[in-house]
Amino acid sequence: MEELWQKACNHFAVPEDVTKSWYTRIKHRLSESPSKRYYHNWNEMMQHKQVHLQHCKPALIIAAFFQYYTYDGVQPCAKANCAAFEEFCCDAVLADLESKNLILRLLGDELAENELHINFEDDANLLQDIDLVILAASSEDYKRYCQLLRQEYEHMSDADYKTMRLKVLQTLLSIPNVYTTSEFQKRYEAAARTNMKDEINSLKG
């Protein structure tokens, strides 16, 4: 992961000390203990994403690092994540405003100027597909993901969680494609649907 981060930061000419300090800061933040990050953390989520980020553009890689900088399963955290990225930009003296605004948009800031970036939708779709790639994991890894995700909603009763989770899964299965990009559709769509159907059967069992 460090090599990915360094490569992205080098693209934007981020000073080496800033690159290193923010890598440490993000890794620590996503590894906090105790926390409710049972899945959305450094050792689980980020490791699953690593291989899929290898060939992504630098802006998308940086967005992936800040996407869950702050995480709360109860309420949205886009504003806090954008604020953390803005702080990084100040430290890095990031001069590429177009890429900065693209990353802000990817992190959920709908007010960020993006008139010049015609590929925003493609970038957003790829970031989302990478986020959902866990759905196509091996049966064993998917079951572990389900267990960790349940722990993140420990504030909910089993009955309420099952109702919520069933609704999410059934909604995903009702749309033509779970993944938006053609590559992910070809490689992961079938496995993701099989895993989700198995989870539905388990929840109903």
Describe each model-derived feature in a short phrase.
Residues 33-45, 71-83:
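Active-site metal-coordination segments of metallo-dependent hydrolases
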Residues 19-28, 42, 61, 96-107:
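Short, well-structured alpha-helical segments
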Residues 69-70, 74, 89-90, 134:
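Hydrophobic/aromatic-lined pockets within catalytic cores
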